[in-house]
């Protein structure tokens, strides 16, 4: 029998699930989209990756004032996109593996309460 049902596999849900499981609870997580959190994986990681790339270009251009020869730097959008996808996939896979290693049962779908003690998917 599941003692804890967590609806949503974002950062808060993942923390709650692993904490409860480590304390010995039987935990079920219901996620309709992606483990790791849609906003986290679709907004934060891509934007932070693009910001980091922009900063690297800025630093590369600034080294000319340090007596170093510079080359014109540009963004390879395909490579940047591949890196973003790799980071997202790695984070999602690592989070899923962590949940499974803690014995958290994962269910794909949308969960909702039908009464204070019942969740349907």
Language-model features, listed with the residues they occupy:
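Glycine-rich flavin
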Residues: 2, 18-25, 30-121
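Short alpha-helical segment within the catalytic ATP-binding CA
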Residues: 15
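Beta1/beta-strand and adjacent pyrophosphate-binding region of the FAD-binding site
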Residues: 1-12
């Amino acid at each position: 029998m599941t003692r804890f049902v967590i609806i949503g596999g974002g950062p808060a849900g993942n923390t709650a699930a692993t904490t409860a499981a480590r304390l010995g609870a039987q935990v079920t997580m219901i996620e309709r989209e992606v483990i790791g959190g849609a906003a986290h994986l679709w907004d934060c990681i891509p934007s932070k990756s693009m910001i980091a790339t922009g900063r690297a270009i800025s630093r590369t251009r600034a080294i000319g004032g340090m007596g170093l020869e510079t080359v014109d730097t540009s963004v390879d959008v395909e490579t940047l996109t591949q890196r973003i996808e790799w980071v997202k996939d790695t984070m999602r896979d690592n989070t899923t593996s962590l949940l499974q290693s803690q014995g958290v049962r994962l269910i794909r779908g949308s969960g909702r309460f039908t009464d204070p003690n019942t969740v349907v998917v």
